[in-house]
UniProtKB/Swiss-Prot annotation:
It is found in: Cytoplasm. It comes from the Bacteria. This is (2E,6E)-farnesyl diphosphate synthase. Optimum pH is 8. Residues 1-21 are annotated as: Disordered. GO terms for biological process: farnesyl diphosphate biosynthetic process; geranyl diphosphate biosynthetic process; geranylgeranyl diphosphate biosynthetic process; isoprenoid biosynthetic process. It is an enzyme of class 2 (transferase). Keywords: Cytoplasm, Lipid biosynthesis, Lipid metabolism, Magnesium, Metal-binding, Transferase. It comes from Mycobacterium tuberculosis (strain ATCC 25618 / H37Rv). Its main location: cytoplasm. Belongs to the FPP/GGPP synthase family.
């Protein structure tokens, strides 16, 4: 029987392995651990900015009324906690690091929505769509500032190293986002460039999440390096799956319009691979990408035909296989260092969740 995963270009998995059908315990625990401190940090903001950040984080509606909304997956905080546990520490000791990476991640989302002019995230209007460009910029900046503050408030002797890891990852994230933006006006984006962009835009913060957890736990260098490599691999897998969902994801699950990435003519990984290796389908896709006459006005039927070009050219299957290859490599990296059974299993679960998710 064909599984749901095939709909997204992913090989069917046994029902017992479909982690996208349930919330991983480690993700639920991550939410529980970071929320009190995350709220305390948001309370430091001024009365103009606090409700905007509260809305984006899923705690309130646009009028400031409390809601229990989808506030994200918490994959990066979970990775901080599991990395700390893998190094033999109590996960609670890594709360400042987990809150920090979650704030950096959300800073990037608010700015990304603004730059892409995306009007919906997590089934709600985005910050810029409600409050305008200026407030969206400031909300993102505010969360980035809080990401530094929460670490500086920590009394760990490893705060300096953790803060450096966060800052370097943020710089890499900005580099990747800048490349992604530059690609919009180019017609000759190479696959290697697209992969380098994904390493900065997505994988850098995943790797830093693992590194921060290990640093705050005082892990030896060999453990830190293995966890960082794991984070980088699952970060690339995450971006590959994100790109698949940006074309074939179901709007009622992703919270974004159908064919959202194609409508914006984004040079995503499956698109770029198809252009380079997809034969006649790739050539037709390349011609469509440079044809600006229908930009932003393409019908769903036209976009469905473009998605079919990517399918026929092999981009969908390549992205799926590449995501699973990175997951396997990431798991192999941590298997070599002999960490305790529970965090080892949690790292495997996180990796498989990333490729099996539907949003």
């Amino acid at each position: 029987m064909r599984g749901t995963d095939e709909k997204y270009g992913l090989p069917p998995q046994p029902d017992s392995d479909r982690m996208t059908r349930r919330t991983l315990p480690v993700l639920g625990l991550a939410h529980e651990l970071i929320t009190p401190t995350l709220r305390q940090m948001a309370d430091r903001l001024d009365p103009h900015m606090r409700p905007v950040v509260s809305y984006h984080l899923g705690w309130s509606d646009e009028r400031g009324r409390p809601v229990n909304n989808n506030c994200g997956k918490a994959i990066r905080p979970a990775l901080v906690f599991v990395a700390a546990e893998a190094a033999g520490a109590d996960p609670h000791s890594a709360i400042p690091g987990a809150v920090s990476v979650e704030l950096v991640h959300n800073f990037s989302l608010v700015h990304d929505d603004l730059m892409d002019r995306d009007e919906h995230r997590r089934h709600r209007p985005t910050v810029w769509a409600l409050w305008g460009d200026a407030m969206a910029l400031l909300a993102g900046d505010a969360m980035l500032s809080l990401a530094h503050e929460v670490l500086l408030d920590c009394d760990s002797p490893h705060v300096g190293a953790a803060l450096r890891a966060i800052s370097e990852a943020t710089r890499e994230l900005i580099r990747g986002q800048a490349a992604d933006t530059a690609f919009e006006s180019r017609t000759d984006v190479a696959l290697d460039e697209c992969l380098k962009m994904a390493e900065g835009k997505t994988a850098a913060l995943m790797a830093a999440s693992a590194e921060v957890g290990a640093l705050l736990a005082g892990a030896p260098r060999s453990v830190r390096e293995a966890l960082v490599a794991y984070g980088r691999h699952i970060g690339l897998a995450f971006q590959l799956v994100d790109d698949l969902l940006g074309i074939w994801g179901r709007p009622e699950i992703t919270g974004k319009p159908v064919y959202s990435d194609l409508r914006s003519r984004k040079k995503t990984l499956p698109v770029t691979w198809t252009v380079a290796h997809g034969g006649s389908a790739g050539r037709r896709l390349a011609a469509w990408l440079v044809d600006e006459t229908g930009s932003q006005t393409a019908s769903d039927d036209e976009l469905a035909a473009v998605a079919e070009l990517i399918e026929c050219g092999g981009g969908r299957r390549w992205a799926s296989a590449e995501a699973r290859r990175h997951v396997t490599q990431g798991i192999d990296m941590v298997a070599r260092i002999g960490i305790p059974d529970r965090p080892a299993a949690e790292l495997q679960d996180l990796a498989h969740y990333i490729v099996d998710r539907q949003a």
